[in-house]
Amino acid sequence: MSDNCLFCKIIKGDIPSDKVFEDAHCYAFRDISPQTPKHVLIVPKRHVEGLNDLQGLSDAELAACLRAAAAIAAQEGVGESGYRLLSNCGPHACQSVQHLHFHLMGGRQMTDKMG
């Protein structure tokens, strides 16, 4: 964990969050500024800055986050209707927190526009 990382502080419980899932490898909570009716952030507990830093995570840790996404989608009622799972990587993608995280978004019809 990083002492200066917002998500590390949330995982440690120093900053409150609306937790929806937690296991040994990942932590998930509702986004404070949701872009869709269902918007959950899925964060590995081990601090890595982003997708370009995956060597800092084990395959099991990364797989746990992806398995969590499917479980959370079902729990949130969007597993069947559909959801989007994405990760912003770097400044041009608007990565705002330098801790790898996945946005699980759903709860409405989305467009195919990604950029």
Cite the ranges covered by each PLM segment.
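HIT superfamily nucleotide-processing domains
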Residues: 1-115
